[in-house]
Each structure stands twice: as structure tokens, then as C-alpha cells.
């Protein structure tokens, strides 16, 4: 198969290729011109408001700031940058794929989307590693889990994400077809296909494996603590549920789209086409909006399941409730988990040392 004939769009935003087959596939999806503008508008309004409130509540909250809050603020900023580009895509979907806002915004908006995708995945990975260190290795990780280290890590993530977005910036162009403008990707070359495959593996599937591994280790440690204590600790049981909810939300949001993208790249590298381009394109069109919606749901997830953030948001919106402490009975912050697991680990170490001394 000649890569020049590859018709499946390989970047993070799917339905903008000038290939006639793509336009035909896109036009046969009935919901795009009606449902997507409405859906993206709702995502834009709720996401912009939610992420602004989340950033403001954590940034201006008096007192000490949790280490995890630094990552959450950066994640909200990354989502916010993506969300401000959504009105451009609302206009594109409403105009049946036409791009009416010029070449600069064609390249710039696609670049910001790519930066957001990489930044979000890397930040989620760092948050998972941070929680792993805080819960599983609380004593050893004290010298690493510092505020200055968190800021350096976040700055590095932004820098790397901006570099990884450059291929998207260079491969995008405003193309005229039948005197109609389309924000499109250039023809796929063998080098681009290989780069897309390597980038997808190392910027999604490897971080995904890291996230799942970290949370599995955390869940194992929590279960061990629960069995060791022999108490029905509702806080720890709820913490395990939250861990799986976070992982499940990440998987539901991103795994379908990136799986179709992986199949598209592999199909483009094969001599024979094993997967129809129309099927892969349709899969990315259906799963793409689900992935993008993740940018607006994160503030609500944190508000519902993290009582620390819930209090910060309520105190930010209603300063009169500053002295009213609620939700403490369902606290699920990392500080609670760290204290509980630290006690458990110290008890385990003490038991081992005692057994060793007795045996000697």
C-alpha cells in the first residue's frame, strides 16, 4: 500500500482531511453537523467555567498547598488551553467541514490541541507516580516529593509537549478544494507514519501502562492495609473506588480513539490493507468527541470525590462559608492515605525487625 494513498487522518483531530474519501465518510455520519456543534458548545461552556473555578480555587486558597494540587492546576490549565479552541471546531462542524478562520488558526489550533493531549497524558502519569510514592513509599519519597521538584517536572512536561506538538504545526495547512477551504493534514509519508507510531506508543500506551501499574500497586497496598487492620475503614474502601474511577475515566476517554489511531497507522505501514479506511475513520470520528470531553469532566470528578478540592471551590465561590467545614466524614485526600499507609508500613517494618531480632 502506497503511503501516499493513506486516507485516514493520523493526528488528534480527525475529520479535516481534504481527501475525497474522508469527506464522503464524514458526510455520511449524520450527527456531525448537528450534534457535534451542540456537544462541543456544551463542553466549551462547562469546561471553561469548571477549569477556571478549579484553578482559581486552588491557586488562591490560603494556607499550604498540597503537592498534587500543582499537577491539578497544570492539568486544568492544559484543558483550558484546549477548550478555548473549541469554538473554531464548532464553526467547522456547523459549516460541514469548511475552515473559515484562516491559515494561522488552522495551524495554531491544531498545535494547541496536540500540546494539550501530550501534556494531559504526561501530567496524569506524574500524578499517578506521585500518588504511588506518597502511598506506597511515603518515607523514601520525602526527598523527591517537594514543591520545587513538582514545578520543575511540570515545566519540563510543558516544554516536551510543545516540542512534540511541532510535527502537527508543520504538517497542517489550509487547502482549497473546489474553491472551499479545509484545515487539512498533508499527505502521509513513510517517515511520518513511523514517527506517528513511535509517538503514539511512547506518549499514550507507555504512560497508560505506567498509570495502570501505579494504581494497581496502590490498590494492592490499600487492600493489604485493610486486611491487616481488620477494620471496615470506609475511607480506604472509598479511596480504592476512586482510584478505579479515575483509571476507568481515563481509559473510556482515550483508549478507543487511540486504538483506532494505532490500527490506522499499522494499516498504512502494511503492503495490504487489513482494515478499511472508512471503518477506521468512522471509529475515530465517533470516539474523538468522547476523548475531548475529558477536558470538561475533570473539575467535576475532583469536586465530587476530593473533599479538599470541594471545600476550596465552595470557599472560593462563597467566602461567607469560609469557616464552615463540611465533607470531612468522606475525606479522601492523599494526606489521609499517606498517613494511614505510613502507619501501616512503619508497623510492618517494626514487625519484620522484631522477628529478625528474635530469630537471631
Swiss-Prot record:
The record lists the organism as Macaca mulatta (Rhesus macaque)
List the stretches on the Cytoplasmic face of the membrane. 55-69, 142-149, 214-239, 306-360
Q: Extracellular side: which ranges?
A: 1-33, 91-120, 171-192, 261-284
SUPFAM superfamilies assigned to the protein according to its UniProt record, in alphabetical order: Family A G protein-coupled receptor-like
Transmembrane region(s): 34-54, 70-90, 121-141, 150-170, 193-213, 240-260, 285-305
Q: Name the gene behind this protein.
A: GPR15
Enumerate the subcellular locations listed in this protein's record, separating them with semicolons: Cell membrane
Q: Cite the Pfam families for this sequence.
A: 7tm_1 (PF00001)
Task: State the name under which the record lists this protein.
Answer: G-protein coupled receptor 15
Leader sequence residues: none
Q: Does the keyword Isomerase apply?
A: no
Query: Which family does the UniProt entry place this protein in?
Result: Belongs to the G-protein coupled receptor 1 family.
Phosphoserine PTM positions read 359
Amino acid at each position: 500500500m502506497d503511503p501516499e494513498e493513506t486516507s485516514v487522518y493520523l493526528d488528534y483531530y480527525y475529520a479535516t482531511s481534504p481527501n475525497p474519501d474522508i469527506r464522503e465518510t464524514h458526510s455520511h455520519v449524520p450527527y456531525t453537523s448537528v450534534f457535534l456543534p451542540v456537544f462541543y458548545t456544551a463542553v466549551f461552556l462547562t469546561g471553561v467555567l469548571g477549569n477556571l473555578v478549579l484553578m482559581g480555587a486552588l491557586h488562591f486558597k490560603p494556607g499550604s498547598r498540597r503537592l498534587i494540587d500543582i499537577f491539578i492546576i497544570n492539568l486544568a490549565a492544559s484543558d483550558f488551553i484546549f477548550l478555548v479552541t473549541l469554538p473554531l471546531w464548532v464553526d467547522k462542524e456547523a459549516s460541514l467541514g469548511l475552515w473559515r478562520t484562516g491559515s494561522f488558526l488552522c495551524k495554531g489550533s491544531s498545535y494547541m490541541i496536540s500540546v494539550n493531549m501530550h501534556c494531559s497524558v504526561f501530567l496524569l502519569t506524574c500524578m499517578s507516580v506521585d500518588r504511588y510514592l506518597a502511598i506506597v513509599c511515603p518515607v523514601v519519597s520525602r526527598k523527591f516529593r517537594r514543591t520545587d521538584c513538582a514545578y520543575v517536572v511540570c515545566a519540563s512536561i510543558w516544554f516536551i509537549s510543545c516540542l512534540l506538538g511541532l510535527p502537527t504545526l508543520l504538517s497542517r495547512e489550509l487547502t482549497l478544494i473546489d474553491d472551499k477551504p479545509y484545515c487539512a493534514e498533508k499527505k502521509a509519508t513513510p517517515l511520518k507514519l513511523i514517527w506517528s507510531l513511535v509517538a503514539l506508543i511512547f506518549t499514550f500506551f507507555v504512560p497508560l501502562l505506567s498509570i495502570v501499574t501505579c494504581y494497581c500497586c496502590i490498590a494492592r497496598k490499600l487492600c493489604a492495609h485493610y486486611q491487616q487492620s481488620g477494620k471496615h475503614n470506609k475511607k480506604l474502601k472509598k479511596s480504592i473506588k476512586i482510584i478505579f474511577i479515575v483509571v476507568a475515566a481515563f481509559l473510556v476517554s482515550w483508549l478507543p480513539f487511540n486504538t483506532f489511531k494505532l490500527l490506522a497507522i499499522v494499516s498504512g505501514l502494511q503492503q495490504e490493507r487489513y482494515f478499511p479506511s472508512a471503518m477506521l475513520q468512522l471509529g475515530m470520528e465517533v470516539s474523538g468527541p468522547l476523548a475531548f470531553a475529558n477536558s470538561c469532566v475533570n473539575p467535576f470528578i475532583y469536586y465530587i470525590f476530593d473533599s479538599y478540592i470541594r471545600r476550596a471551590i465552595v470557599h472560593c465561590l462563597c467566602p461567607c462559608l469560609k469557616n464552615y467545614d463540611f465533607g470531612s466524614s468522606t475525606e479522601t485526600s492523599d494526606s489521609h492515605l499517606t498517613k494511614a499507609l505510613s502507619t501501616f508500613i512503619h508497623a510492618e517494618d517494626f514487625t519484620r525487625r522484631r522477628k529478625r531480632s528474635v530469630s537471631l
